[in-house]
């Protein structure tokens, strides 16, 4: 694509169409842009539009399109073509910083994100002048430019907060500090001076405080991994100014908005975070500043209002106190009883109250409420921070704190009892307080794992939780119902089983509650209870114990999916999946009805898949229906095919990318259930599975390979006769997969199935070419993963076609190649093979090479016989060699190129491990002994001589053990 006015005009028209609400106009425009984005100059045309277009809407659209293009294509993925030509990469990096800084804020943010994506890949090695260019802009004095630089630096450096320590990371941070720390500090001081100068200018203050927020965020990122020497030397400057800003109050920066945090709140919140970081990680160096910060933050807490806009500030301030009180250094600041009482009374209890804003979220924004409350994204809420402070105080003062709070809990419950309909919020706070007090350690998976022994959890459950749940009206006091259900979830490991069993029918009835939060919590609680393990590592609740409730459980779960707001509720679908898994054959009578409902749901959501977790659990539930029913009655597979195939066809025809990998997995499960030949409905699909376009999407590959393996296992003879012309296509898929480091193991899965199941004559003409392809890959790009897969394949080939056939095919490619493969690959690398079945295949294959390959006994290959036997005994007896060559250590084969749909394995579609030598060989050590005995019978005297003269003593001892166990000798 040329950088011409005509192309700019065309691009403008298509960008405009991508904003059209009509899909008939929008989608073709999106497809067109996708089709041209691989052309040279495409990204430069977008940047030119950004600079030259007069239409602001088009400029914003171009900036978003450019950012998404960079997100999808900038990373260079091994084995994949480079999606952006080098000239475009150079031009983008040369122009983007200037363009970003000279653009309006809306566009600046998009380009700043694009710079951070590029920087993540290229900085510092491939973009060494980025920092210099950014730092030089600090001198401009233009805070629009300066804030652009700070915003970009923040998005570049914030990853230092969660990266693992490494030399590479240290080197990068040092480079950044050397270039950035001093200019940032000077800018910090200058900005604070300007705040004093412009103290009465609201618009100037807004810009300056935006800068201070970004500077404070950068301080956090640059100090997170370790305390840099520069910041230690300049701690006075930073901490004194942070303290001043923390105590600052300027009427011009206060906002009337009760919801949205203002600049002053955001800055103080970040300073609390910075102080907490230093208090936690660098307490020795920070010690002399700490008392001033504790005082300032305490004053902040007792003077800040209850409005939502202060939530982040208050929660960060409380988190600061929580991090301080946990450190032995600062224990003395909190040990006075009056201090503890004051903290409880003035900070913890007020911030645990259920406010009008919380009630509004509970009723009108339930999805967000659940996300915060159940999934732990409540990190910045007042309640969560207050809860963390309680836990922190309990570390050293558990007795006094429990005593103080017990009084509060009792008085709250008394207030509630006086007038429940008015005072229900008192009980809500009491439950939350008990939960905070009792929870010492908690995980999402297991609930509370360590509890405060001073709190009687069962007594509280029986007296205050069960009565609410036993009420006949499931819609009364929904917040308290949700609290009670959450209590069951959190303390499920502490409450005795008999009480939990009583709760199950109550939870089932709450699936009918109108409140989204209540019926979601009920579903989640049931799912968590059904995954609990008993003492013998089976489920705590048996199918027999749940049997009385099966019908009402399944009815209410599926009915809950019809309640307003829950048509794609992932917690309900997960509970359905877990119920199926626990109840097993007890669900069979209900399956005809349930599979219809699941299929209807699948058809509905396939129109616009938007809830990935819901979709995943739905497919898991479908797989469970198939597994459980067909285990009892394999012929029932036909009923599932009738129910599902119409929907599956629609999904495949409409190219619903998110669902295609799932469809292939379910089809594999169905096909594997057939015991005889492949039904014609599957064979009609077979040619379509080989289309290259399907294999271009990484997320499809594991599911497609599994499905092709099912075709080969169930219908190799049909393929050989009715679809012989498709065998080259099948091998073409293998060739594509084997060329990729990320997918070569999938290529071997396919190849192994071809070798194991296809009639030999149908692949004869391709065999030599298969080996040549494998050797080319070995030569060009040898990895440990490839070697392991290659070893399994050649041994499987040996088992299937015979040892002599393996030797002949190697030597047919190149004279003496068989010896080279033995010497350079099999003998030194066999120790790396992992997996019981894989080791067994290799053991049986090598045994065949040792005992059924005449050239091993009477040619130049004979010298390799004993080393090969030695390596086989090593495979049996030595630990697996899991060392990885240095150059391979950093290959990340899991990287998904761009933003394609990743593969999601369905647990309940899982394939049983297949052992191709299971019927032939039970114990490979005994098999070796018997095979050596047979060989020694054919060549008397030779085998004992070779073994006794060349095998090391330890290996010889192991071999004698095998012979003894097999009751044979070497003649």
Swiss-Prot record:
Gene null: resulting phenotype: Complete embryonic lethality at around 5.5 dpc.
PROSITE patterns: IMPORTIN_B_NT
Modified residues annotated as Phosphoserine in this record: 112, 931
List of residues that carry N-acetylmethionine: 1
Gene Ontology biological process terms in this record: intracellular protein transport; nucleocytoplasmic transport
Any one cellular-component term (Gene Ontology): cytosol
MF GO annotations: small GTPase binding
InterPro entries noted in UniProt: ARM-like, ARM-type_fold, Importin-beta_N, XPO2_C, XPO2_central
Record keywords, A-Z: Acetylation, Cytoplasm, Nucleus, Phosphoprotein, Protein transport, Transport
Primary location recorded for the protein, binned into one broad class: cytoplasm
Domain Importin N-terminal, residue spans: 29-102
Record's subcellular location: Cytoplasm; Nucleus
Tissue expression from the record: Ubiquitous. Detected in embryos from 5 to 17 dpc. Highly expressed in adult testis, heart, brain, lung, liver, skeletal muscle, spleen and kidney.
Disulfide bonds: none
Subunit structure: Found in a complex with CSE1L/XPO2, Ran and KPNA2. Binds with high affinity to importin-alpha only in the presence of RanGTP. The complex is dissociated by the combined action of RanBP1 and RanGAP1. Interacts with CFTR.
PANTHER family noted in UniProt: EXPORTIN-2, IMPORTIN-7, 8, 11
Function (record text): Export receptor for importin-alpha. Mediates importin-alpha re-export from the nucleus to the cytoplasm after import substrates (cargos) have been released into the nucleoplasm. In the nucleus binds cooperatively to importin-alpha and to the GTPase Ran in its active GTP-bound form. Docking of this trimeric complex to the nuclear pore complex (NPC) is mediated through binding to nucleoporins.
The protein's name in its UniProt record: Exportin-2
The organism of origin for this protein: Mus musculus
């Amino acid at each position: 694509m040329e950088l011409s006015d005509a192309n700019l005009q065309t691009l403008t028209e298509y960008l405009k169409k991508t904003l059209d609400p009509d899909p008939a106009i929008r989608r073709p425009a999106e497809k067109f842009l996708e089709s041209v984005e691989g052309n040279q100059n495409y990204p430069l045309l977008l940047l030119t539009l950004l600079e030259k277009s007069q239409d602001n809407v088009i400029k914003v659209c171009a900036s978003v399109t450019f950012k998404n293009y960079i997100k999808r294509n900038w990373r260079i993925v091994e084995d994949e073509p480079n999606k952006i030509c080098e000239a475009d990469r150079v031009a983008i990096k040369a122009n983007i910083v200037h363009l970003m800084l000279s653009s309006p804020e809306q566009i600046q943010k998009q380009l700043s994100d694009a710079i951070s994506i590029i920087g993540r890949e290229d900085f510092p090695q491939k973009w060494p002048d980025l920092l210099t260019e950014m730092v030089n802009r600090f001198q401009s004095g233009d805070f629009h430019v300066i804030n652009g630089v700070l915003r970009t630096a923040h998005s570049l450096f914030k990853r230092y907060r969660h990266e693992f320590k490494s030399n590479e990371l240290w080197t990068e941070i040092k480079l950044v500090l050397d270039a950035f720390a001093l200019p940032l500090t000077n800018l910090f001081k200058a900005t604070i001076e300007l705040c004093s100068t412009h103290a009465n200018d609201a618009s100037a203050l807004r810009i300056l405080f935006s800068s201070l927020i970004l500077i404070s965020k950068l301080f956090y990122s640059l100090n997170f991994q370790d305390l840099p020497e520069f910041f230690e030397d300049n701690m006075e400057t930073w901490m004194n100014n942070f303290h001043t800003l923390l105590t600052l109050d300027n009427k011009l920066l206060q906002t009337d908005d009760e919801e949205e945090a203002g600049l002053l709140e955001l800055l103080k919140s970040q300073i609390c975070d910075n102080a907490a970081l230093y208090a936690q990680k660098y307490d020795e160096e920070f010690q002399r500043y700490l008392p001033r910060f504790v005082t300032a933050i305490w004053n902040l807490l007792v003077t800040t209002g209850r409005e939502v806009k202060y939530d982040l500030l208050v929660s960060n301030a409380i988190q600061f106190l929580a991090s301080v009180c946990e450190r032995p250094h600062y224990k003395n600041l909190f040990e006075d009883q009056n201090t503890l009482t004051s903290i409880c009374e003035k900070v913890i209890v007020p911030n645990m109250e259920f406010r009008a804003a919380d009630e509004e979220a509970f009723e009108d924004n339930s999805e967000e409420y659940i996300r915060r409350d159940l999934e732990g994204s409540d990190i910045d809420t007042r309640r969560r921070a207050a809860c963390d402070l309680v836990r922190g105080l309990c570390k050293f003062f558990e007795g006094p704190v429990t005593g103080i709070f017990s009084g509060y809990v009792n008085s709250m419950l008394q207030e509630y009892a006086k007038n429940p309909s008015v005072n229900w919020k008192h009980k809500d706070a009491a439950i939350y307080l008990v939960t905070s007090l009792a929870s010492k350690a908690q995980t999402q998976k297991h609930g509370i794992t360590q509890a405060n022994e001073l709190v009687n959890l069962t007594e509280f459950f029986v007296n205050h939780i069960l009565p609410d749940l036993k009420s006949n009206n499931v819609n009364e006091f929904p917040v308290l119902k949700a609290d009670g259900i959450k209590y069951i979830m959190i303390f499920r490991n502490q409450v005795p089983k008999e009480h939990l069993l009583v709760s199950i029918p109550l939870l089932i009835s709450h699936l009918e509650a109108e409140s989204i939060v209540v019926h979601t919590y009920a579903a989640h609680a049931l799912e968590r209870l059904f995954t609990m393990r008993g003492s013998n590592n089976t489920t705590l609740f048996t199918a027999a114990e749940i049997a009385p409730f099966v019908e009402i459980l399944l009815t209410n779960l599926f009915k809950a999916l019809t309640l307003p707001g829950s048509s794609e509720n992932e917690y309900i679908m997960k509970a359905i999946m877990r119920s199926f898994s626990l109840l097993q054959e007890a669900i069979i009578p209900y399956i005809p009805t349930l599979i219809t409902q699941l299929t209807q749901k699948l058809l509905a959501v396939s129109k616009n898949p938007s809830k990935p977790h819901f979709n995943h659990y739905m497919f898991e539930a479908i797989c469970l229906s198939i597994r459980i029913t067909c285990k009892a009655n394999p012929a029932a597979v036909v009923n599932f095919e009738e129910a599902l195939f119409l929907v599956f066809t629609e999904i495949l025809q409409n190219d619903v990318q998110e669902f295609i990998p799932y469809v292939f997995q379910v089809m594999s499960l169905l096909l594997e259930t057939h015991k005889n030949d492949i039904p014609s409905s599957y064979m009609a699909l077979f040619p379509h599975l080989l289309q290259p376009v399907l294999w271009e999407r990484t997320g499809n590959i594991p599911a497609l390979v599994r499905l092709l393996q099912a075709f080969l296992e169930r219908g190799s003879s049909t393929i050989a006769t009715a679809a012989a012309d498709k065998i080259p296509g099948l091998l073409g898929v293998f060739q594509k997969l084997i060329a990729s480091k990320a997918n070569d193991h999938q290529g071997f899965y396919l190849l192994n199935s071809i070798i194991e199941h296809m009639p030999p004559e149908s692949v004869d003409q391709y065999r030599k070419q298969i080996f040549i392809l494998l050797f080319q890959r070995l030569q060009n790009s040898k990895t440990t993963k490839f070697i392991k897969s290659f070893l399994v394949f050649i041994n499987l080939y040996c088992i299937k076609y015979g040892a002599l056939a393996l030797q002949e095919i190697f030597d047919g490619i190149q004279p003496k190649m068989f010896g080279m493969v033995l010497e350079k690959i099999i003998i030194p690398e066999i120790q790396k093979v992992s997996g019981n079945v894989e080791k067994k295949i290799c053991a049986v294959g090598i045994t065949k090479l040792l005992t059924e390959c005449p050239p091993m006994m009477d040619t130049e290959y004979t010298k390799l016989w004993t080393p090969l036997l030695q390596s086989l005994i090593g495979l049996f007896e030595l630990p697996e060699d899991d060392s990885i060559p240095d150059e391979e250590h950093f290959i990340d084969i899991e990287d998904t190129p761009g933003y394609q749909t990743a593969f999601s394995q369905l647990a309940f579609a899982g394939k049983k491990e297949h052992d191709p030598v299971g019927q032939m060989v039970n114990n490979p050590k005994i098999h070796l002994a018997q095979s050596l005995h047979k060989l020694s019978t054919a060549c008397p005297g030779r085998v004992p001589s070779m073994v006794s003269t060349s095998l090391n003593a330890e290996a010889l001892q192991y071999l004698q053990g095998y012979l003894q166990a097999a009751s044979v000798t070497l003649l």
